[in-house]
Structures are given as structure tokens and as C-alpha cells.
Amino acid sequence: YANEYQAIRPALKKDIRAVHNLIQRGVRNEELVKRTRAELERRIQDYFVFEVDRNPVACVALHPYPDDNKAELASMYVDPRYENQGIGSRLIAYAEAQARARGYETLFCLSTQAVNYFIHKGGFQLGTPDDLPPLRREAYERSGRRSQVLIKPLTEPVKSLPGTSHSDSAS
């Protein structure tokens, strides 16, 4: 997704400070789990940024669990000055498209505060810790955060939006 002023793209090393600052804001609001700069540096290839006028104003991570054919949507944060503009929904759709392109069967996320957002805007459904890959479940249980597990199967075809039917009518 891109236009003159807005774009979603993979995060680069030069984005580490901006991504870290976005995540820190989410941590202060108790919306996100703390990430160190070192962790970001190690996993920057998992992150995507949403830019406005070439400035990152939102981020999301897609952490792969290839042995389980699952991917985790994590660390999603939108600068409050850019909220209610559909950026979060676009980040979810972008991460989902990346997960589908890589052949993952399930996208999952953990949330303590945005459960309704992920269900209503992201198309996720409530899951259980049993839906998590074993490595992720261990970390979930150690964290003690008691986040809600949300899952989204990626094996079904993408549903078309209302008013955009793809029927094979002869014209």
C-alpha cells in the first residue's frame, strides 16, 4: 500500500529508533510489551512501518513460527495523532497478506486491551493458549500478562468486501 504521502514498507535499520519510540509509547499505556533496542535490532526484519511524509507513524511486527505454520502479529502501535484514519486496519491487512504470501495457515495475536478492535476490525476470533505454537505458549505462560489469544485462519479465501462481487456473469 502506498501513495504520495503514505506507505507501508519493511522496517530498516535506520527505523530502529522510530520503531522503538512508537513501541515505548504503547508500553507506557500498557498496550504493548516492552522491547529493547537490542531485541529490535535482532528482529528488525519482522517489522513494518507505516509512513506519512516519510516519517514512521505506526508499526507492526510479523513474527514467524514456520515449524507450526503460524505467524504472530505483534507490536502494533499507531501514533495517537494518526488514530481513527484506518492505519491499524491497513497494517493488519498488510501483515496478513505477508503471512499468506509466506504460506502460513494461521495468524495470531495476543492482546490485553484491544481484543474488540482485533475481532471487529481485523477479523480475528477468540482463541485459547492451545492455539499458540509451543515456543510462544511457553513465553505466554511465563509472562503472566494473561493476554487474550486471538486467531485468524488464513487457509480460507479472502472474503470480498460488500459491493465487490466476483461473479462470473457474462457481459
Language-model region placement:
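Short amphipathic alpha-helix that is part of the acyltransferase structural core
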Residues: 1-34, 51, 72, 146-171
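Small/polar loops that bind or transfer phosphate-bearing groups
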Residues: 11, 109-110
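Short alpha-helical
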Residues: 14-18, 68, 113-116
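A conserved beta-strand-loop-helix scaffold within acyl/acetyltransferase catalytic domains
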Residues: 32-53, 57-70, 74-79
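Conserved acetyl-CoA-binding loop-helix of GNAT-fold acetyltransferases
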Residues: 78, 84-97, 101, 109
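Conserved active-site alpha-helix within GNAT-family acetyltransferase domains
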Residues: 101, 105, 112-140
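Surface-exposed acidic, glycine/proline-enriched linker/cap segments
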Residues: 140-146
